[in-house]
């Protein structure tokens, strides 16, 4: 499948590979191994891939036995792999690098040796047990791989043209028109249901069977639960509880994560490491409250107030509708045709969070409450900085609407209070493009262009 990260790999090969290894961080099953091996086949004369989740003891021992003796190391590695490496024209891939930290530590010296290029892939890269006994190399260029974004999904369906036109309309603030807008909304609903996990997308492309798509997604969820049991040492119960309550937390009006849902007497300090583990696994997209809409949102972050979105909305749907009695194909087709009585707001907001993360944004929201002054009660779904920072008006507030009938009371209060700080407010909705009363209204499928 065509992935945008391929261009980043090419840029690294051209400009950085002589001085840095490439580290690709991402959740399990987002396609890290596949895209790296595809890149290796196309762009190098030969390559060796070591999967540390199943590497032999003989391979692992090479890193200890021949550490610092790189001529011997490469000789025995080639003999074990049955692949001839060529200086300046070969790639070595360390897959699931977090499972063998000694290999990651060796990257410093392998890069300095200069004979070959190196790509590492993994998740849980910063968890203490994966880094506690090693010196993390500075010779790493780190990038993220997310689930397939909406445009990549369309490419997989064979549509290479629509997003170019959508992008043009976005730049001109020009509506698509009824027919094309309806087509794009149909595509978006399908993307929301199938999601962006490559296995699920491939299943849809090959079979057009939503039951089989759902089965692929549930297999991924089972894999994530198994990972929690195997690798969240001492945190298994907390991480599992947080993971399983994501749908019910997003179902709430405010969508902020309530620690009380994790059990009586739970305190933030007790679960912070569990939240960190889930974040590092890349299966969730945390969104933190910012106390003011100013440049440097990270400095205004309130870590005690967060929302927790699933990294993939297709997985969220399978997690939320877990009843065995529900036939996936019937459920999904009702969702497709908007004939299911569910909280579409949580699904659409999760979808926008997924789009913004894939576009490179960190996630922030704004929330304010007052018992005495209604004007101080406001919630804004997302805050993102303008592309070009000026002396003021640098933060776009974003509201997400899942239906055609809605009000903008909270957004209006927010804009009025912070009129000297915020840029044009944006509403992502089910309608077409329009600009009205200083508000930019964009269809939901343009969320990834922000």
What are the functions of these language-model segments?
Residues 1-16:
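Pre-Walker A adenine-sensing motif
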Residues 13-20, 29, 38, 42-45, ...:
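A cross-kingdom feature that marks ATP-driven nucleic-acid transaction machinery
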Residues 24:
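Hydrophobic anchor at the beta1->P-loop junction of P-loop NTPases
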Residues 32:
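Conserved lysine of the Walker
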Residues 54-88:
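Short glycine-rich substrate-engagement loop in P-loop NTPases that contacts/grips substrate
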Residues 93, 117-123, 144, 153:
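Structural recognition of the conserved hydrophobic beta-strand(s) that form the central parallel beta-sheet
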Residues 109, 126-142, 154-159:
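Short regulatory helix/loop adjacent to the ATP-binding pocket of P-loop NTPases
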Residues 158-348, 354, 362, 368:
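Interdomain hinge/linker elements that couple catalytic modules in large macromolecular machines
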